């Protein structure tokens, strides 16, 4: 806050009110009074005292001029990574800022940042389910995972590797060296339960400290059996840390009786809510699924806006992205459902 003095502030012998000094963060001024040899008549001194008290009261009651106070406020830029495809799944490129419309909690927002095929650094965690139902396919997961890592990582990107069964175990911390991920993939080991939601929760927190895009790629047949973390808790952590989830659902080859349909649905909705995507994998199809994840990450639009006209008291702000001119073209637009804010973000 900046306090400026105008007009009366320059008067010699001005009286500083307690209120003005407190607002500006300044100590009261004390002026040295010179003793005059010839004392004023008692009536003159009384008149001066009354005038001084009146002036002090006037200054104390006088509101500070608006132009004399400056407030500075930080406003958060909300970043949305958006994928657009047609009804056949083909990627739609060549769109411009003017093609998109963004709203938050039903209130229109102005797009301040726009980029095609964002070159922001990519921070990705590969999380592999090694519970008993999928551990038998670990050789396929290891080989396909290595090819995915070597094809995806660029000089500015980083990747980490975790496995989850009865518990979550980090095999490789964030690195830009594919060989380190390879060595981690060679150390996969099995377990009994499936701590799926624990893996999402912990991976989201780890990714939350990174700049750029944050992506969690899950390879699982679906279904959390550890029951330490709930679906809602896992999803909230992903949204709080702006993590996009890509679910690669490795369903059993056997009949549908061996499938966890509820768990598969959870993987699908986690991807939808965070702006990612889900893929079903048939026998030997992991390479194709990884390739589609890589393509999806390389064909994103980045939209950014500074929130305005927010509804007070909201913790979660829901966003909506549309392409008005595409109303009749059945475009599929994917982006995260919204974002959490510990306190309302003020607009300008």
Regions found by a protein language model. Give the residues of each.
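Bacterial N-terminal signal peptides
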Residues: 47-60
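Scaffold/interface architecture of coatomer-like assemblies
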Residues: 64-348
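Low-complexity, intrinsically disordered or signal/transmembrane-proximal segments
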Residues: 10, 22, 31-33
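Ser/Thr/Pro/Gly-rich low-complexity, intrinsically disordered segments
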Residues: 1, 7-10, 19
């Amino acid at each position: 806050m900046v306090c400026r003095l105008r007009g009366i502030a320059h008067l010699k012998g001005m009286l500083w009110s307690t209120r003005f000094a407190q607002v500006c963060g300044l100590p009261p001024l004390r002026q040295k009074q010179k003793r005059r040899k010839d004392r004023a008549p008692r009536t003159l001194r009384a008149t001066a005292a009354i005038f001084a008290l009146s002036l002090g009261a006037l200054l104390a009651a006088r509101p500070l001029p608006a132009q004399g106070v400056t407030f500075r406020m930080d406003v958060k830029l909300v970043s949305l990574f958006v994928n657009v495809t047609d009804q056949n799944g083909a990627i739609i490129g060549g769109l411009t800022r003017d093609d998109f419309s963004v709203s938050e909690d039903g209130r229109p927002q102005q797009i301040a940042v726009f980029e095609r095929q964002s070159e922001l650094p990519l921070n990705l965690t590969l999380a592999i389910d090694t519970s008993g139902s999928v551990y038998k396919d670990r050789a396929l997961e290891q080989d396909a995972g290595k090819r995915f890592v070597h094809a995806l990582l660029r000089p500015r990107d980083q990747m980490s590797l975790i496995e989850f069964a009865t518990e979550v175990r980090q095999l490789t911390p964030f690195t830009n060296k594919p060989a380190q991920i390879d060595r981690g993939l060679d150390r996969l080991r099995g377990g009994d339960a499936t701590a799926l939601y624990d893996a999402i929760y912990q991976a989201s927190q780890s990714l939350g400290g990174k700049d750029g895009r944050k992506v969690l790629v899950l390879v699982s047949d679906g279904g959390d059996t550890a029951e330490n973390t709930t679906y809602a808790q896992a999803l909230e952590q992903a949204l709080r840390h702006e993590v996009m989830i890509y679910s690669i659902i490795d369903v059993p080859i056997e009949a549908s009786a061996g499938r966890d349909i509820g768990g598969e649905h959870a993987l699908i909705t986690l991807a939808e809510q965070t702006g990612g995507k889900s893929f079903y994998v048939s026998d030997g199809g992991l390479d194709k699924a990884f390739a589609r994840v890589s393509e999806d990450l390389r064909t994103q639009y980045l939209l950014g806006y500074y929130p305005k006209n927010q509804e007070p008291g909201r913790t979660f702000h829901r966003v909506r992205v549309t392409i008005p001119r595409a109303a009749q073209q059945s475009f599929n637009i994917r982006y995260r459902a919204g974002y959490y804010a510990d306190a309302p973000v003020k607009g300008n």
